[in-house]
UniProtKB/Swiss-Prot annotation:
UniProt-listed Enzyme Commission number(s): 2.3.1.30, 2.3.1.31
SUPFAM superfamilies tied to this protein: alpha/beta-Hydrolases
Organism of derivation: Streptomyces lavendulae
Name assigned to this protein: L-serine/homoserine O-acetyltransferase
UniProt-reported outcome of changing G52A: Has much lower activity for the acetylation of L-serine but keeps the activity against L-homoserine. Utilizes L-homoserine as a substrate for acetylation but barely utilizes L-serine
Cell location: Cytoplasm
Gene name as annotated: dcsE
Principal location listed in the UniProt entry: cytoplasm
Length: 374
């Protein structure tokens, strides 16, 4: 088991006995984060970024780590989330393997990796850990919390559980809960990992582990992150070269789209812990904003009770994983609570991953919204 920690990561310790929503507690746990841009004297220009399932806290390049970040085109000087104006905090999710405590981390009580002894993880736990991190950094109120994909779920949980912590919200391809299609896909991803003999009931060590399962899981995921329209335009029925086909043997990859999936799945499997994948994926399926909390009314009621002044809600029309109807639900619920909400459906072939790869369409509305907030 391995953790994959970016070199510029900083850490905030969680309080001992950090209670997990579905039972259990963590001791000696920590949250990894990175910051970009300067905090002003009033400490009121902080923007929190909550990530999807796989990213680390390295959203953008920094002087002490010039490696391009996973959101390099969105975060930085003069970019839509302008670090000349904003102090951006990107938090690695609790349960991940990118610096925050998760199944691959060492349990201080045993000196061994947690593996499956790590408590059941919830999106609410991720939100609570992020809220603790913000307060530990001396920030009592965020100018904005930005959440994309799973991070959109985490942001909504944070706003519900810590209503005074953020003034505004940007939701990019988020959701108040997972729909059956998304649950089915992630269920198959987890099954692929658990069915791999190398998983060993979570007790694999460094080395191969359930690599074949991880490759299949990632390929399944990538099929849902983009759209059929993009696959058609990008690959068509183009075949790989004769020599490459011969190297693969009978029934091996023949089309460029297969080669693309394999390349990116191999790269992902090299740098993500399978147990972390299982925990985070399961947390997404279990999340429902309408569960728990007082007030009733399900998810719409929870959204209407959030205390944000403004919100920007964006989603791709081609997103099959977190479809546009879920973005409309978020916008309607926040608006019912009195927030000034901008809802922007985006025409893009990039599907769910559009917030990552189609900055031409997602960037300007984000920049415009933050200019109003400033």
């Amino acid at each position: 088991m391995r953790e994959f920690i970016p070199p510029a990561s900083r850490f905030i310790e969680l309080p001992d006995g950090f209670a997990m929503r579905r039972g259990g507690a963590l001791y000696g746990a920590r949250i990894a984060y990175e910051t970009f841009g300067s905090l002003n004297a009033a400490r009121d220009n902080a923007v929190l970024v909550l990530t999807g399932l796989s990213p680390d806290a390295h959203a953008a390049s920094r002087p002490d780590d010039p490696t391009p970040g996973w959101w390099e085109a969105m975060v930085g000087p003069g970019k839509p989330v302008d670090t000349d104006l904003w102090h951006v905090i990107c938090v690695n999710s609790l349960g991940s393997c990118k610096g925050s405590t998760g199944p691959a981390s060492t349990d201080p009580r045993t000196g061994e990796p947690y593996r499956l002894s790590f408590p059941e993880l919830s999106i609410e736990d991720i939100a609570d850990a992020a809220a603790h991190t913000v307060r530990a950094l001396g920030i009592s109120r965020l100018a904005c919390v930005v959440g994309a994909s799973m991070g959109g779920m985490s942001a909504l949980a944070l706003l519900a559980r810590h209503p005074e912590l953020a003034r505004t919200h940007i939701s990019l391809s988020g959701a108040v809960h997972a729909l059956p299609f998304s649950i089915a896909v992630r269920s198959l991803q987890r099954e692929a990992i658990r069915s791999d003999p190398g998983w060993l009931q979570g007790h694999y060590d460094e080395g191969e582990g359930p690599r074949r399962g991880m490759l299949t899981a990632r390929k399944l995921g990538m099929m849902t992150y983009r759209s059929a329209q993009e696959w058609d335009c990008r690959f068509g029925r183009t075949r790989i070269g004769e020599r490459r086909r011969a190297d693969q043997g009978r029934f091996g990859p023949e089309f460029e789209v297969e080669s693309y999936l394999d390349f990116h799945a191999q790269r992902f499997a090299d740098r993500f812990d399978p147990n972390s994948y299982l925990y985070l994926s399961h947390a997404m399926d279990q999340f429902d904003l309408g569960d728990g909390g007082g007030g009733g009314g399900g998810a719409p009621g929870a959204l209407s009770r959030m205390r944000v002044e403004r919100a920007l809600v964006m989603g791709a029309r081609t997103d099959i994983l977190f479809p546009l109807s879920q973005q409309q639900e978020i916008a309607d619920g926040l608006s019912a609570g009195g927030a000034d909400v901008s809802f922007l459906p985006v025409d893009t072939p990039a599907g769910h991953d559009a917030f990552l790869v189609d900055i031409e369409r997602f960037g300007p509305p984000v920049a415009k919204f933050l200019a109003i907030v400033a």
